[in-house]
């Protein structure tokens, strides 16, 4: 069959090529090389755990296609610049803030799964590991820090589509409940969990992590990976985790915070942090010290804290992967492709605006790491005190 097709169509292709001008042939070859090169680059850089979601099938998650433009307009208007130059949400009510986080994840979930990984976090990579392995190691560390053991009831605070929760449940034998505000992420989490055969070990629950539908003292341990930064106030989510944990239980967190090197009087520092806030749906950027004070304020005992991004000098930095995406042109090409698909109606109208919002912050994330002014993985290991006898 293949030989027959070749015999039939090859002469026609050659004949058609002979009728083309040299510049047309050169343009065609160049286009083929560029497109083929891009496909190879993004295949190499994307996680081997990527999903089947296509660039041309990115959606607004739980937002209907014709409503994406309206929600994007609301997202843009949600931010304002303070007198000190810092970008923050101007919402007065917690309800509005929660709504905007939900909107952000409606818009970004498909893109994260397609272009990043099914674990929505950064990680530092050992030289012998690939990206997916580094992600798993990052998740294993927090399970160890939270003292998770077989049979425990554990809560994953801000679970996304659930991959860290599934990883930790698989490796520890614990039963993990993952909480996310976003209904579309619940749908995706259930899809992945069923596919992994872990429905009896990991359960996603749609809820606001500042107001969870669980009884007091009902969990043996808790962890959060780059998620609590989305809370309107850190005290609100930390207090709720404190409530649902049993006395003596541990809560381990990777918190996204600015570091001591951040200078609020440095214009470039402020621009970078503002970009991270806007491109990641964060109410505002907390400092490492503010996160520490928030946990202590609600009653937790702090065992220790450190920046996991600086813990070892032999690991590739957490910004290695985004730096590769920028340097290879994947970010620029993807934004361009999404813009074209937006214009011709393949993607929801104004989805390109959102892609630009997220894509523009990636070079700034790299610079924030290189300057040492931000980390997505400041470790805090908290413990709820035992009840006094």
Swiss-Prot record:
- What positions belong to coiled-coil segments? none
Q: Give the signal peptide, or none.
A: none
Q: What's in the keyword line of the UniProt record?
A: Endoplasmic reticulum, Lipid biosynthesis, Lipid metabolism, Membrane, Methyltransferase, Microsome, S-adenosyl-L-methionine, Transferase, Transmembrane, Transmembrane helix
Q: Per its UniProt record, what Pfam families does this chain match? A: Methyltransf_11, Sterol_MT_C
GO terms of biological process kind: methylation; steroid biosynthetic process
Listed GO MF terms: S-adenosylmethionine-dependent methyltransferase activity
What SUPFAM superfamilies does the record point to?
S-adenosyl-L-methionine-dependent methyltransferases
> Which cell locations does it reside in?
Microsome membrane
Entries under PANTHER family matching the protein: 24-METHYLENESTEROL C-METHYLTRANSFERASE 2 (PTHR44742:SF2), PTHR44742
Q: What is this protein called?
A: Sterol methyltransferase-like 1
Instruction: Give the organism the record lists.
Output: Botryococcus braunii (Green alga)
